[in-house]
């Protein structure tokens, strides 16, 4: 008798987040086209991961060519803590009984309080040069960890890859 409710949890697939200038379709598609996106299968955090080069800031999703060591700025803001139950508008198109049956009164119902970000972990991936190259040292998960002080405003850090110019290889960070 729980099959309908349980089925919604088996393949949730996570959430996609898009940096956009608005909530309209055109703004969201523009953010997707720029690849200013990230995914989360957990809390609904806010995340910025930017390359800081001279006076230029390139947002996540940007492809660029560099000869010097890259410098990054990462900011993460915690998800809203959830209030019990469902918001009032949840039952405008569905009866309270049906909402209780399907959701067991568990809805997205954010408070004004955000969870704290305890740390930021950065992963570094360097693609293979040849099929014979061992990938064990190319995927560094986790490459760098930065501890964060508790704050409702989130956590912001900057770091540099001091090996990039020396290694002179394509690299992906996230």
Listing of model-derived features with the role each one plays in the protein:
Residues 1-174:
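C-terminal functional module detector
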């Amino acid at each position: 008798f729980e099959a309908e409710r349980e089925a919604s949890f088996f393949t949730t697939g996570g959430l996609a987040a898009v940096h956009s200038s608005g909530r309209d379709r055109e703004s969201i598609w523009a953010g997707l086209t720029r690849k200013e996106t990230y995914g989360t299968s957990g809390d609904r955090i806010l995340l910025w991961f930017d390359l800081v080069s001279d006076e230029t800031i390139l947002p996540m999703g940007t492809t660029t060519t560099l000869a010097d060591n890259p410098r990054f700025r990462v900011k993460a803001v915690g998800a809203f803590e959830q209030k019990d139950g469902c918001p009032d508008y949840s039952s405008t198109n569905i009866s309270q009984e049906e909402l209780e049956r399907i959701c067991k009164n568990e809805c997205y119902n954010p408070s004004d309080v955000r969870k704290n970000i305890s740390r930021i972990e950065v992963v570094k991936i360097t693609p293979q040069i040849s099929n014979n190259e061992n990938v064990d040292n190319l995927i560094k998960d986790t490459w760098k960890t930065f501890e964060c002080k508790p704050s409702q405003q989130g956590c912001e850090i900057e770091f540099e890859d001091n090996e990039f110019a020396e290694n002179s290889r394509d690299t992906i960070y996230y």
